[in-house]
Amino acid sequence: MQSAKRSIVRRYPVKQGLLAAAVLLAGSSLAGLDQAKAQGVVGHSPAQTARAAPGTGPGLSRLPLISESVFPLGGTTATLRGREGTSGAGPRGSSGAGGPGKSAQEEDEDIAPTAFGTFNWPYTHARVANTNIGFGSPLERVPVTGYPFRATGKLLMTFGSSTFVCSASLIKKGVLVTAAHCVFDYGKRKDGWATNVRFYPANVSNPSTTAQPYGVFTARRIYIPTVYFNGTDTCQAGAVGIVCNNDIAVIVLNARRGQYAGNIVGWYTYGWNGYSYVTSDQFGNQHVADITQLGYPVAWDNGYQMQRNNSFGKRVLGTGTNGKQLLNTQLGSAMTGGSSGGPWMVNFGTNAAITGTATAGSHPARLVVVGATSWGYVSTGPKVQGASYFGQNNEFPNADYGGRGAGNIGALVNTACTAFPAYC
């Protein structure tokens, strides 16, 4: 494996105005296919039923689940665990000054921030939109319809006759990143692909009955790792096809009326090999980062409204059934099915003007996607989820793929952008 250098790909600014639709030459497309094969990536153009409805109701989750015994927490938080909370004078949250008090009924309707689950991993979870039920005016959609939230959206797809739901985010003006299991059944080769793949940026309600703030974009081309296609990825025993090195996909979206999705809503950067992670004795020498997770879990607001979760994420190492090193990231989270494919970002938010002696610290680049929600536990008690680690691993050992990054994410993005350069 080549040197594991941490890095990111920079985000381009949001651009306004119409863009001419890209014209892709046949020779370029063939070159893209050759590139995909050489770099361990499989591409597929999903079928789109003409004017297909996205389905009714919340939809079915694609999030794969495992038991706690298959991939136990082990020492992940053992060295971080403090005392159980008491009614004494220890640290506690104050009531704040955010406005008038709420009735018990109103509080029950809100998504309350929670401290931790049975794995004692702290997190904070909340709905993104500043509203309770319904969206009577555009102001009630704030901040979900503003940047940077709106570069994340709800992903719908069809397997067989059923509609399923996931989440995804833009990392190029016309390219999404999500979980591979959202668009492909592990190891099923030519029979594993989803159809009718659709992306709704900043979704705020039921897309089958209500037009969304930024409409819908359909998938033009999907790319997944060849090992995921073949069913030969490095995976945890008892969780083959679930806890794996490369549950990652990128999707090239069709432009709409001459505009790419990112030119309307913006897009993020992406990173690899642990960008903004740090090995710290303050965290028991674990390799950790402060991570913001976005997604559309069905158990919260029927999966119609974006949820935000913040927690420390930790790189976890294991050994796959093939004897190779398994790399994942875990974090504390109350999200459930439907959150699959949603971005895990470091340094979420927008920059403030720095004055005086303040500094941004090390590795401060904003809105860097370093993972996508991949799996959770069958029990709702642990409140922990996992994601394939973006970067070099056994299957994608190179430190650079065409100047677009290292490892799995570099290979996938490079393949997509080689075949569809105008979308990048």
Regions found by a protein language model. Give the residues of each.
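Gram-negative bacterial Sec-dependent N-terminal signal peptides
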Residues: 2-34
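C-terminal cap/linker of serine protease catalytic domains
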Residues: 366, 370, 377-424
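Chymotrypsin/trypsin-fold serine protease catalytic domain
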Residues: 244-332
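Conserved catalytic-core segment of clan PA serine endopeptidases
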Residues: 129-150, 156-165, 171, 192-262
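Terminal peptide-recognition signature
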Residues: 155, 168, 174, 178, ...
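Acidic glycine-/aspartate-rich tracts in secreted/extracellular proteins
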Residues: 182-184, 203-207, 255-258, 297-299, ...
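Catalytic nucleophile loop of clan PA
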Residues: 333-372
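Protease-domain processing segments flanking chymotrypsin-fold serine proteases, especially trypsin-like
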Residues: 33-170, 411-424
